[in-house]
């Protein structure tokens, strides 16, 4: 039995989101193909993920014997909790829109929790080495324009998850803002690809 972590990186519901429509289709198809697997869901917009601000980063570099505030201790513990949640999953699927050429800020905060030296990668004399080897990561993204996987959001997500050693792949639905009349056609193609990926994921 494997564990799938489902990461919702959109502030709205599937009614208003093509990426979440794809995510819903993926989960439904995945459950059909892998009925024994455990599925855990994470909504980054409601999870209160600690951001890398002054309070948290100063706590990270404070040292073992430093006196931390209760707030710093809480943020460190919650940050580590999201790292551990990611590490406990065998497979991860992430769905998000592209905002201003990038992923939403809340999703970026989550990504920061899964790119941690000593946990998901390590430094060696030959350079950094990923520690999340064998972990499948599927990224579902909706782009109003057409970017062919060269948009900064996709490049960033690919770089991060390949850096930590995971098996990263992406399926995007794009171009619906250019030609709204083709939205349903583009969505149908997206859903078909997502469902097929879920069967073998």
UniProtKB/Swiss-Prot annotation:
Quickly give the catalysed reaction: 2 a quinone + NADH + H(+) = 2 a 1,4-benzosemiquinone + NAD(+); N,N-dimethyl-1,4-phenylenediamine + anthranilate + 2 NAD(+) = 2-(4-dimethylaminophenyl)diazenylbenzoate + 2 NADH + 2 H(+)
Binding residue positions for FMN: 17-19, 98-101
State its role.
Quinone reductase that provides resistance to thiol-specific stress caused by electrophilic quinones.
Q: Which UniProt keywords apply?
A: Flavoprotein, FMN, NAD, Oxidoreductase
Q: How does it assemble?
A: Homodimer.
Query: Which gene carries the instructions for this protein?
Result: azoR
Which Pfam families did the record assign? Flavodoxin_2
Single GO MF annotation: oxidoreductase activity, acting on NAD(P)H as acceptor
Which leading EC class covers this enzyme?
Answer: oxidoreductase
Cofactor (UniProt): FMN
User: What is the top-level taxon of the source organism?
Assistant: Bacteria
Report what the protein is called.
Answer: FMN-dependent NADH:quinone oxidoreductase
């Amino acid at each position: 039995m494997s564990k799938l972590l489902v990461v919702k990186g959109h502030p709205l519901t599937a009614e208003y989101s093509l990426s979440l429509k794809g995510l819903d289709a993926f989960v439904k198809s995945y459950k059909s193909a892998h009925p024994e697997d455990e599925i855990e869901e994470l909504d980054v917009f409601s999870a209160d993920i600690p951001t890398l601000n002054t309070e948290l980063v100063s706590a990270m570099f404070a040292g073992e014997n430093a006196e931390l505030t209760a707030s710093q201790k809480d943020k460190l513990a919650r940050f580590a909790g999201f790292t551990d949640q990611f590490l406990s999953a065998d497979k991860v699927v992430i769905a998000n829109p592209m905002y201003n050429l990038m992923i939403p800020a809340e999703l970026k905060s989550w990504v920061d929790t899964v790119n941690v030296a000593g946990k998901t990668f390590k430094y060696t004399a030959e350079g950094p080495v990923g520690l999340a080897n064998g972990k499948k990561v599927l990224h579902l993204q909706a782009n109003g324009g057409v970017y062919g996987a060269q948009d900064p959001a996709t490049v960033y997500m690919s770089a991060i998850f390949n850096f930590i050693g995971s098996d990263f792949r992406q399926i995007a639905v794009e171009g619906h803002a250019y030609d709204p009349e083709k939205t349903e056609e583009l969505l149908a193609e997206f859903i078909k690809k997502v469902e097929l990926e879920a069967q073998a994921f």
